[in-house]
Amino acid sequence: LPKDRIGKNSMVQNDIGQRFHFEALGIRGEYVRLDQTWAALCALHPYPSAAAALLGEALAAAALLSGTLKYPGTLTLQAAGDGALRAVMAEVRETRALRGIVRFRDDDAALPPIAAPLNHLGEGLLTLTLRPPKGEPHQGIVRLGGDHLADAVERYFEQSEQLPTRLWLSTTHGVQGLLLQALPGGDCGSEGFERLAIMASTVKDQELAELDAQTLLKRLFPEDDIRLHPPRPLAFECTCSRERTQETLAAMAPDTLEEILREDGEILMTCQFCQAR
């Protein structure tokens, strides 16, 4: 990394996304770390380790993909299947606020730790949705497959976008992720992309957890000229509000509300994302 390209990005920072480019090759990349967001979600939802790992992968993947968007919007990643886990969802809004959740098919079902948490979803689909501030949402769907969520995301870009894409997601020590993607219309060539992908595949979970983007990229790609952009802050934030709760209640049938009041004496609504009441 030439000194004039680096800037003041050498300190490890919590909850950031950081873009970089291999300008001579027409390849872009994204780096994310979500330490505080992950800690907040784990405190709110004491998920089994396998479910927590899958949610961490979903959050990292969604944050990485949101950094590649050409236009502003809310990106939602959802993987749903017929397994013990019904679905995992991660959302990144245009304000760079994140939230996510895991849904179980049976709240009491055992969920043993496994090396490939994606397998707890069984057969299913990965859905990527982009909701722009105005206009209709854009949605892409691909079948789940492979051992990791990254496999399904890579397959989506291969089938739907025809863009060579690789992701590395880590939930061993917090949540981090790395993405490489050929630029649309670029002339990187398959050999150039594969060379970088092979080099990036040597990354270790400990390196992702402990190294800032500058140090990590210098270690993985010591001979390449990389332009590293300033970090963008990311944060856990829910969209629930008293106003939205009132709108939900107003949409319910009066008879239903009266029945709840007769049985419980009050109406309690809890946000499934942040547990606010």
What residue spans do the PLM features occupy?
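Cys/His-clustered metal-coordination modules, chiefly Zn-binding fingers
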Residues: 201-277
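Interaction interfaces in information-processing and related assembly proteins
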Residues: 11-230
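N-terminal amphipathic/basic-hydrophobic helices that include classical n-h-c signal peptides
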Residues: 1-11
